[in-house]
Amino acid sequence: MKIALISDTHIPMSLHRLPDQLLKQIVGVDAIFHAGDITSSSVLDVLAKIAPVTAVAGNSDPPEVESKLADRELIQLEGHTIGLKHGHQPHELQINYIGQPYDSPEMELFFQLMTAQLPGAEIIVFGHFHRSVIMHWNGVLFINPGAVAATNGSCSFAMLELGASVNVQIIPLSSCD
C-alpha cells in the first residue's frame, strides 16, 4: 500500500493552489494523509479526487476547516498502527521546540507527548515544523513530510509504503509556489 504524506499546505495564505509537481507525483497512491494546516477545505476536495484522504486539524486551520477534522487519528493499515497529528501542543505546556534540532532535549519531550497522545502507534506522521525528518525514537517511526508551503525555501512531501516492510522517502518539490 502506497500512502502520500502531506502537511502544511497553507492555502491560500502561502500558496494559491497545490503544486502541479505534487499532484502528478501522488497519482496512483492508495491513500493520502494530510498532517494539518490545510487552511482551505478545497485542498481536501482536490486530494480526494486522487485517493481517499485522512486529515487532521492544524494550529492554522480556520474554524470551518478545523470543525470537520479530528485533532488526531489512529489508523490501522496493512498490520500497522499509524498515528496522524499536526504536532502543535497546548500553549500551557510552554515547550520551546520550534527551530530545535530533532535530536534536542526539547524534541525528546515532544516525541514523548506525541507517543502518549497516539498510544500504540508504530508510525507517527506529523507536521507543524516545516522541516522533514524520518527517524526512530523509542521504537516508533516518526515522519514529518516537511511543508508543501515552505517558509524556509524548501518544500517537500513523503511517500510511505506499507507491506511486509515499511519504506518511507522524503520527496523534495522543485518549486514551493
Report each predicted region and the residues it spans.
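Residues at the starts of beta-strands that form the adenosine-phosphate
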Residues: K2, D30-A31, P52, N167
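Binuclear metal-dependent phosphoesterase catalytic core
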Residues: I6, L15, Q76-E78, H136-N138, ...
